[in-house]
Amino acid sequence: MLRWLRDFVLPTAACQDAEQPTRYETLFQALDRNGDGVVDIGELQEGLRNLGIPLGQDAEEKIFTTGDVNKDGKLDFEEFMKYLKDHEKKMKLAFKSLDKNNDGKIEASEIVQSLQTLGLTISEQQAELILQSIDVDGTMTVDWNEWRDYFLFNPVTDIEEIIRFWKHSTGIDIGDSLTIPDEFTEDEKKSGQWWRQLLAGGIAGAVSRTSTAPLDRLKIMMQVHGSKSDKMNIFGGFRQMVKEGGIRSLWRGNGTNVIKIAPETAVKFWAYEQYKKLLTEEGQKIGTFERFISGSMAGATAQTFIYPMEVMKTRLAVGKTGQYSGIYDCAKKILKHEGLGAFYKGYVPNLLGIIPYAGIDLAVYELLKSYWLDNFAKDSVNPGVMVLLGCGALSSTCGQLASYPLALVRTRMQAQAMLEGSPQLNMVGLFRRIISKEGIPGLYRGITPNFMKVLPAVGISYVVYENMKQTLGVTQK
């Protein structure tokens, strides 16, 4: 069908200027099923599918958003032809950006090279899968005609869009702060899309964390109070919190957890860009290892900056009703009774937890990505929303599992000054005490509610993130 499209709609360059309007008119008439001189979205959807023309995700809606100049919900022939001409210019630029050796063909090695400049590494075998979805004649190269035919009615015109499916972040926020920052392309940085995406992610994180705050507070309570002698389970923990402070107490500490999103994201993003510059030469691609090191160091920098808020979040969550009137009161009392050093209790295990979390999170995601591309990417490199969310959630969960003992010790160090009769132990002392009294399972107290919040957090943050991207103009509605 792509061959038919090339011969029928898109003539050779020699006669293109003379015949193109006629060819476009013939295609327009084929789409205009009722012959009223305009094409609505229903006719476009049905016509393109009948012609076997490949479409991207939500392609018809995006075509109408771009091409429907007078916003009457229909495309007349002039709008239709203008859209195709403008779109073809963009496709030509995208093709040239990929054709590194200017031989008029795109090869697998050129796709690998282009993605490397964007900070994304794939194998040549995976690049061949991208080619297979576009290549018509089986040469394992894509010429301009094949490229144009494939993306004629596909709003994806940029190589960055093609591989953006597999960016590690999809707007997921499961409440942790140790993930490696997003990788933004040069175009996103220049156009200002990067800050819109960060803002959308921040809002999604705020909604997601607020929605799952009761489970987060329960996790903290079980980390601090759970032991063999005081077996706090999920239902008992919720009953105890509601009995002590009412329904509203389930969200105690959430305000701090939400407020810290903005400064943490800003510092992490800035630090990540600086560390990348230190670890790579100008214009050089950033590999997976350099990305891991840069991301880990950026996470450590951001955590150093906002760590006092982490301590206050724990103190507010563990505190009893009336103990603190708010964030400011909590900070004032900690400073008065324990001094400035109290704001960094648990800082060492928190920093140590970044390495296993970020490393395993990134490694598992890359492993899942490679497995899907090698085994399931038959006709398209787009894995779909469910696969992306599943990979992101699973990799984050594995990272949490590896770093959880350090997170538990961090939380106990943050809160132990509040517990009457509790000795003020350092990290090593707490590890020894927990293992001797509670065994290895003691290092995983509270992990059940932590895992319980993953699925709702993923779903909520993704939905909010996608809607906010539309609102902020990152994606078309």
Curated annotation (Swiss-Prot):
Gene Ontology MF annotations: adenine nucleotide transmembrane transporter activity; ADP:phosphate antiporter activity; ATP transmembrane transporter activity; ATP:phosphate antiporter activity; calcium ion binding
Solcar repeats: 192-278, 286-371, 383-471
Binding site for Ca(2+) 2: D68, N70, D72, K74, E79
One Pfam family this sequence matches: Mito_carr
Domain EF-hand residues, every copy: 19-54, 55-88, 86-121, 122-157
Region named Regulatory N-terminal domain: 1-173
Segments in the Mitochondrial intermembrane topological domain: 1-197, 273-295, 366-388, 466-477
Expression sites (tissue/organ): Expressed in all tissues tested. Highly expressed in testis, expressed at intermediate level in small intestine and pancreas, and weakly expressed in kidney, spleen, liver, skeletal muscle and heart.
Subcellular location: Mitochondrion inner membrane
Example of a GO cellular component annotation carried by this entry: mitochondrion
Residues bound to Ca(2+) 4: D135, D137, T139, T141, E146
Record PTM N6-acetyllysine, positions in chain: K320, K336, K437
SUPFAM superfamilies in the record: EF-hand, Mitochondrial carrier
Region spans: Linker region: 159-168
Amino acids binding Ca(2+) 1: D32, N34, D36, V38, E43
Modified residue annotations for N6-succinyllysine: K320, K437
Database matches in Gene3D superfamilies: EF-hand (1.10.238.10), Mitochondrial carrier domain (1.50.40.10)
Binding site for Ca(2+) 3: D99, N101, D103, K105, E110
Residues passing through the membrane, by range: 198-215, 253-272, 296-309, 346-365, 389-406, 446-465
Record topology, Mitochondrial matrix segments: 216-252, 310-345, 407-445
Membrane topology summary: Multi-pass membrane protein
Domain notes: The regulatory N-terminal domain/NTD formed of two pairs of fused calcium-binding EF-hands, binds calcium in the mitochondrial intermembrane space and regulates the antiporter activity of the transmembrane domain/TMD. In absence of calcium, the apo form of the N-terminal domain is intrinsically disordered and binds to the transmembrane domain, inhibiting the transporter activity. Binding of calcium leads to a major conformational change and abolishes the interaction with the transmembrane domain and the inhibition of the transporter activity.
Function (record text): Electroneutral antiporter that mediates the transport of adenyl nucleotides through the inner mitochondrial membrane. Originally identified as an ATP-magnesium/inorganic phosphate antiporter, it also acts as a broad specificity adenyl nucleotide antiporter. By regulating the mitochondrial matrix adenyl nucleotide pool could adapt to changing cellular energetic demands and indirectly regulate adenyl nucleotide-dependent metabolic pathways. In vitro, a low activity is also observed with guanyl and pyrimidine nucleotides.
Family membership: Belongs to the mitochondrial carrier (TC 2.A.29) family.
Disorder this protein is connected to according to its UniProt record: Fontaine progeroid syndrome: An autosomal dominant progeroid disorder characterized by prenatal and postnatal growth retardation, decreased subcutaneous fat tissue, wrinkled skin, an aged appearance since birth, an abnormal scalp hair pattern, sparse hair, hypoplastic distal phalanges with hypoplastic nails, a widely open anterior fontanel, facial dysmorphisms, and craniosynostosis. Early death is observed in some patients.
Protein name: Mitochondrial adenyl nucleotide antiporter SLC25A24
Source species of the chain: Homo sapiens
